[in-house]
Amino acid sequence: MPFIENEGVKIYWDEVGDGPAILLIMGLAYPSQMWHRTRPVLAERYRTIAFDNRGSGRSDVPPGPYSIEAMASDAAAVLDAADVRNAHVYGVSMGGMIAQEFALQYPDRVRSLILGSTTAGVPKSVRASPEETLRLLEREQSTPNEAAEAAIPFIYDPGTSRERIDEDLAVRKDWLPRSDAYINQLMGVFAWDSHGRLEQITALTLVLHGANDHLVPPSNAEFIAARIPNAKLVMIPKASHIYSTDQPEAAHGALLEFLDSFK
């Protein structure tokens, strides 16, 4: 299993497929295995490079907090290890924040930018309802399995089958985060902000969002797409925060249409 070390932290990464490179950046407390629906689709025509953020999966759990800037540096180190100068960069949720920071810090390394289910930063973002925010904060009072179960109503669309949700839970079960790692990532999320910098992103950008996202309301995506100069917004009907599970065909169709336009 390949590891790289960045700032004294060991980061797990791997690659699947051939073709133009695409860097995949996962969200809060999720391992890179959660690309299990999207990665096989992309790997048919792209070189997919994925990694576990610090504190997640097989990567180290150093003392925190983990800043979004540090995790963007980890992403750059992964591309260095893969000997990739520039790549399509796709981040979801917290990974979308990391992808924004990556595009701001390393603009010449971004062939295109895909931002999924994300925000320009918590301090000024449109928040979830108070009930959903409380449920997220109460996660730390639960076991990891209880927390994963409690999250279902506000990260999946009500129309998504329980069978499909259970497939996601099965992927995650061996890589549930330590509570300190979750808190360390969450502190980085709450501290980060790109609202005043979005206009500086020069990459052609696709903003993907579930139309029924209860965790990160869709108005966050509208804000991002309106301020990045070369951005296109796609709202996915009947989808919530994890749109690749709610509506995989629609999500992957929009993603491939965008990526294939660069060939």
What are these regions (language model features)?
Residues 212-216:
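Acidic catalytic loop of the alpha/beta-hydrolase fold
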Residues 50-90, 253:
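Active-site loop/oxyanion-hole signature of alpha/beta-hydrolase fold enzymes
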Residues 7-61:
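Conserved HGGG/HGGXW glycine-rich cap/lid loop of the alpha/beta-hydrolase fold
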Residues 91, 95, 99:
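Gly/Ala-rich beta-loop-alpha elbow adjacent to hydrolase catalytic centers
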Residues 201, 207-209:
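Short beta-strand/loop motif that positions the catalytic acidic residue
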Residues 231-263:
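Catalytic active-site module of serine/aspartate enzymes centered on a nucleophile-bearing elbow/loop
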Residues 100, 104-105, 111-140:
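Flexible "cap/lid" loop of the alpha/beta hydrolase fold
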Residues 125, 145-197:
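Conserved alpha/beta-hydrolase catalytic His-Asp/Glu region
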